[in-house]
Regions:
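Glycine-rich phosphate/oxyanion-binding loops and their immediately adjacent helices
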Residues: 41
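Conserved acid/base catalytic micro-environments in cytosolic active-site loops
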Residues: 1-12, 17-29, 33, 44-45, ...
Length: 361
């Protein structure tokens, strides 16, 4: 159950470094909306404290003695579902995405040593802890590892039934029959991993994604999406050519737009503009694909705020389709909810149905 607005958010800090535990706790020391109710040095101690203290959110280091963060996440998801924010160094990018697949809500990237003057990290940590007030009341971690072993993924998170995506030969050039532009933020990485696992190698669509994520993580995330399914997926670079069964993730701290030159559809990747409220900007991406009219689909997944709203209006006005993730599965209903309230959603679907819908193109 998410915390009410009348009491502080109860936070449990889990890290094997006493120095890091102190620095993380200090971020919230004088904040009226957050109470640090406990600290743990490893996963075993953390599980005991979760049961005893019933925190609203946990910050988690992944590399710890006795019980590491991955084991903690598996047991937590099966016993006491609780929002978890991973605090990890830039050098541990692969581990971060493994944690997200195991059900972690989000992550904060930090330098290898967290110092009290790391202002940007402290602000990001505070923002993401406060975000738990916006979670759906029935929050359950969106783990990709099926507990019964009969789903689409093996116990280690490896997809079953898919071979690694082949490198596509793009000559002679064939444009995609449809461009699917996807907007996502908090909860988005695990949602995208599930979606991309559904897309068949025979799809005639190209997929372009604006996921709010730090710049050092988007390439690793694109590589995981590429391994997850049959669509060849990369971090976008300026000039990339859209083709059937290709996927492109906008690099962090940049914005991505589609440009059409004759029959060619290419990507333009560059710095953000002062008018961009969110970076990467789903609004800019959506507006750029809108001229395709009925040949484009805008998808708005889980996330805080309203990025994608203006772009969704442009797509609808041009004759395209907008799909919003329903509140049943959206971890945070801000972005899709804004599109629904504005009357812009052609379809409002839970995540599995979005995958089914898009896999037909």
């Amino acid at each position: 159950v998410t915390p009410s607005s009348t009491r502080p958010i109860r936070l449990l800090v889990v890290d094997d470094s006493a120095y890091n535990r102190r620095n993380i706790a200090d971020v919230f020391a004088d904040h009226p909306e957050v109470e640090v109710v406990g600290k743990a040095a490893d996963g075993e101690e953390a599980l005991k404290l979760v049961t005893l203290l019933k925190p609203d959110v946990v910050t988690l280091d992944l590399e710890m003695p006795r019980m590491d963060g991955f084991t903690f996440l598996r047991i937590l998801a099966a016993t006491v579902p609780t929002p978890v924010i991973v605090v990890s160094s830039y050098s541990q990018r692969e581990n971060v995405f493994k944690a997200l697949e195991l059900g972690a809500l989000d992550f904060v990237a930090k330098p290898d040593r967290l110092t009290p003057d790391a202002t940007e990290v402290r602000e990001e940590l505070l923002k993401k802890v406060l975000l738990v007030r916006s979670l759906r009341p029935s929050f359950v971690p969106r783990s990709l590892v099926r507990r019964n072993g009969s789903g689409a993924f093996a116990a280690d998170g490896t997809p079953t039934g898919f071979d690694p995506a082949p490198v596509r030969v793009l000559a002679p050039y064939r444009p995609p029959k449809c461009v699917v532009a996807i907007a996502s933020s908090t909860g988005g990485p695990s949602a995208l991993l599930q979606l991309f696992a559904r897309f068949p190698a025979t799809t005639m669509a190209a997929f372009v994604v604006a996921q709010h994520m730090p710049d050092k993580f988007t390439r690793t995330f694109a590589e995981r999406l590429d391994k997850r399914g049959a669509v060849r997926t990369v971090e976008a670079t300026d000039g990339d050519l859209l083709a059937p069964a290709t996927g492109f993730i906008c690099p962090g701290r940049k914005c991505m737009e589609m440009v059409q030159k004759g029959a060619e559809l290419r990507l333009r990747v560059g710095p953000s503009a002062p008018t961009d409220r969110y970076v990467p900007s789903a609004n800019r991406l959506f507006k750029s694909v809108a001229p395709l009219g009925a040949a484009c689909i805008g998808v708005i997944l889980t996330g805080m705020g309203d990025d994608g709203l203006e772009g969704a209006r442009a797509i609808r006005d041009a004759g395209g389709v907008i799909i919003a993730e329903s509140h049943e599965t959206a971890i945070v209903n801000g972005m899709p909810g804004a599109a629904v309230r504005a009357g812009l959603a052609s379809e409002v679907l839970p995540l599995p149905s979005i995958g089914e819908y898009l896999s037909k193109f």
